[in-house]
Amino acid sequence: EHFRPGHVRHQVVVGPKFLYALFNPQDQLHPVSRAFMTFVRDGDLPYRRLIVNDHIVDEAATRLKKQASMRNAASFLTTLDESTVYQFEPISEDVFDAAKATFVEWTDLDASFTDFVVAAHMDELEVDHVLTYDRHYDAFDVTTLPYRNQD
């Protein structure tokens, strides 16, 4: 029982900070994001479905436009449209309501509303891995990737 292999996850949620770094060559984490995606593309990692939702796309596209360039934002949006790996999953009203309730209740967590939406959406989709550089996700019951040293 203890040595039974775990369920292989073929899907992962892609957070806005990971996407920002991936589509902004000037970002210090761009090489890490690119390397991670190369592993995904080459089949070295089990992920075949990269999930994004409305809030993730909004935050990543807006940040790319304002802090990088419109060209980077457009490249991101075009990639989402043309890629067979990225899967857009709109959030339900139940996810929004759950995120809203948790956002209001968890007053000690300095996370964005998007973070709460993503966590609630992951719970609904039964996805427990998220690609992110956002440490706020450590407060939720999810596994963050790429792995990093815990300070």
Question: Could you tell me what each predicted segment is?
Answer:
Residues L19, V57, Y137-D138:
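A generic structural signal for short hydrophobic patches within well-formed alpha-helices
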Residues E1-V52, K65-S75:
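Short, well-structured N-terminal submotif of metal-dependent ribonuclease cores
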Residues T62-E89:
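Helix-adjacent hinge/juxtasegments
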Residues E89-D128:
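Active-site neighborhoods of divalent-metal-dependent phosphate/nucleic-acid chemistry enzymes
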Residues P46-R49, V85-Q87, E126-D128:
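Short active-site oxyanion
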Residues Q87-I91, L145-Y147:
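Short acidic-hydrophobic, aromatic-tinged amphipathic segments that line or gate anion-handling sites
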Residues E1-G6, A119, L125-D151:
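Acidic, PIN/NYN-like endoribonuclease modules and their adjacent C-terminal/linker elements
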